[in-house]
Protein backbone atom coordinates (compact mmCIF):
# COMPACT_ATOMS: atom_id res chain seq x y z
CA UNK A 1 0.00 0.00 0.00
CA UNK A 2 1.16 3.51 -0.71
CA UNK A 3 1.97 5.61 2.33
CA UNK A 4 -0.78 8.07 3.16
CA UNK A 5 -3.54 6.09 1.44
CA UNK A 6 -6.70 5.16 3.31
CA UNK A 7 -7.90 1.61 3.82
CA UNK A 8 -11.37 2.59 2.59
CA UNK A 9 -10.36 2.00 -1.02
CA UNK A 10 -11.95 -0.68 -3.20
CA UNK A 11 -9.84 -2.48 -5.81
CA UNK A 12 -12.04 -2.10 -8.89
CA UNK A 13 -9.62 -3.17 -11.65
CA UNK A 14 -6.10 -4.57 -11.95
CA UNK A 15 -4.42 -4.86 -15.36
CA UNK A 16 -1.03 -5.35 -16.99
CA UNK A 17 -0.56 -2.84 -19.79
CA UNK A 18 0.95 -3.92 -23.09
CA UNK A 19 2.96 -2.44 -25.99
CA UNK A 20 -0.29 -1.75 -27.90
CA UNK A 21 -1.15 0.78 -25.16
CA UNK A 22 1.92 3.00 -25.66
CA UNK A 23 2.33 6.51 -26.97
CA UNK A 24 5.13 7.93 -29.14
CA UNK A 25 7.41 8.13 -26.07
CA UNK A 26 7.12 4.42 -25.27
CA UNK A 27 5.10 4.92 -22.08
CA UNK A 28 1.43 4.10 -21.64
CA UNK A 29 -0.87 6.56 -23.44
CA UNK A 30 -2.83 8.76 -21.03
CA UNK A 31 -6.07 7.97 -22.85
CA UNK A 32 -5.69 4.29 -21.93
CA UNK A 33 -5.37 5.26 -18.27
CA UNK A 34 -8.41 7.58 -18.56
CA UNK A 35 -10.49 4.78 -20.07
CA UNK A 36 -9.59 2.42 -17.23
CA UNK A 37 -10.31 5.17 -14.66
CA UNK A 38 -13.78 5.58 -16.15
CA UNK A 39 -14.42 1.83 -15.95
CA UNK A 40 -13.13 1.55 -12.38
CA UNK A 41 -15.16 4.53 -11.18
CA UNK A 42 -18.28 3.14 -12.88
CA UNK A 43 -17.81 -0.11 -10.93
CA UNK A 44 -17.76 1.92 -7.71
CA UNK A 45 -20.79 4.00 -8.73
CA UNK A 46 -22.79 0.87 -9.52
CA UNK A 47 -22.09 -0.43 -6.01
CA UNK A 48 -24.33 2.40 -4.74
CA UNK A 49 -27.34 2.28 -7.09
CA UNK A 50 -29.34 -0.31 -8.97
CA UNK A 51 -29.67 2.08 -11.93
CA UNK A 52 -27.42 2.47 -14.95
CA UNK A 53 -24.87 5.24 -14.57
CA UNK A 54 -23.35 7.52 -17.19
CA UNK A 55 -20.22 9.62 -16.95
CA UNK A 56 -20.93 13.35 -16.83
CA UNK A 57 -17.56 14.75 -15.73
CA UNK A 58 -13.96 13.97 -15.03
CA UNK A 59 -13.47 16.87 -12.66
CA UNK A 60 -9.78 16.43 -12.09
CA UNK A 61 -7.15 14.09 -13.44
CA UNK A 62 -3.56 14.39 -12.28
CA UNK A 63 -0.82 12.29 -13.86
CA UNK A 64 1.99 11.97 -11.30
CA UNK A 65 4.31 9.47 -13.01
CA UNK A 66 4.45 7.50 -16.25
CA UNK A 67 3.19 3.95 -16.58
CA UNK A 68 5.47 1.50 -18.40
CA UNK A 69 4.81 -1.59 -20.47
CA UNK A 70 4.56 -4.57 -18.13
CA UNK A 71 3.58 -2.57 -15.06
CA UNK A 72 0.79 -4.10 -12.98
CA UNK A 73 -1.66 -1.23 -12.62
CA UNK A 74 -4.35 -1.15 -9.92
CA UNK A 75 -7.33 1.20 -9.94
CA UNK A 76 -8.60 1.84 -6.41
CA UNK A 77 -11.88 3.66 -5.90
CA UNK A 78 -13.55 5.47 -3.03
CA UNK A 79 -17.02 6.96 -2.82
CA UNK A 80 -16.64 10.73 -2.45
CA UNK A 81 -20.32 11.72 -2.35
CA UNK A 82 -23.85 10.83 -3.37
CA UNK A 83 -26.25 13.54 -4.53
CA UNK A 84 -29.88 13.12 -5.51
CA UNK A 85 -29.05 11.83 -9.02
CA UNK A 86 -25.24 11.90 -9.00
CA UNK A 87 -22.41 9.84 -7.58
CA UNK A 88 -18.87 11.22 -7.27
CA UNK A 89 -16.00 8.75 -7.15
CA UNK A 90 -12.30 9.28 -6.44
CA UNK A 91 -9.83 6.99 -8.19
CA UNK A 92 -6.21 6.32 -7.21
CA UNK A 93 -4.05 4.56 -9.78
CA UNK A 94 -1.05 2.62 -8.53
CA UNK A 95 1.64 0.90 -10.62
CA UNK A 96 3.91 -1.90 -9.55
CA UNK A 97 7.06 -1.97 -11.62
CA UNK A 98 8.63 -5.20 -12.86
CA UNK A 99 11.90 -4.40 -11.08
CA UNK A 100 10.15 -3.57 -7.76
CA UNK A 101 6.93 -5.63 -7.63
CA UNK A 102 6.41 -5.01 -3.90
CA UNK A 103 6.46 -1.22 -4.20
CA UNK A 104 3.35 0.66 -5.32
CA UNK A 105 3.88 3.96 -7.12
CA UNK A 106 1.01 6.45 -7.27
CA UNK A 107 0.82 7.30 -10.97
CA UNK A 108 -2.56 9.01 -11.40
CA UNK A 109 -5.54 10.27 -9.42
CA UNK A 110 -8.93 11.42 -10.63
CA UNK A 111 -12.41 12.48 -9.57
CA UNK A 112 -15.28 11.25 -11.74
CA UNK A 113 -18.98 12.16 -11.59
CA UNK A 114 -21.78 9.86 -12.74
CA UNK A 115 -25.52 10.35 -13.04
CA UNK A 116 -28.04 7.56 -12.50
CA UNK A 117 -30.37 7.13 -15.49
CA UNK A 118 -33.37 5.06 -16.48
CA UNK A 119 -33.68 3.01 -19.69
CA UNK A 120 -34.61 6.15 -21.64
CA UNK A 121 -31.53 8.01 -20.40
CA UNK A 122 -33.45 10.30 -18.04
CA UNK A 123 -31.92 11.23 -14.68
CA UNK A 124 -33.34 9.28 -11.76
CA UNK A 125 -32.68 9.40 -8.01
CA UNK A 126 -29.66 7.30 -7.05
CA UNK A 127 -31.56 5.65 -4.21
CA UNK A 128 -34.96 5.52 -5.97
CA UNK A 129 -36.73 2.42 -7.24
Description of each model-found segment:
Residues 56-66, 74-79:
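Conserved interaction-surface patches within small, structured recognition/assembly domains
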Residues 2-57, 112-129:
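Hot-dog-fold acyl-thioester-processing enzymes
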Amino acid sequence: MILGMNDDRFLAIRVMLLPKDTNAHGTIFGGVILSQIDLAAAVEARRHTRHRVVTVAMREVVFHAPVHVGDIVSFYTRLASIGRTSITVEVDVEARRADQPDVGVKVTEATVVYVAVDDAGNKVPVKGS
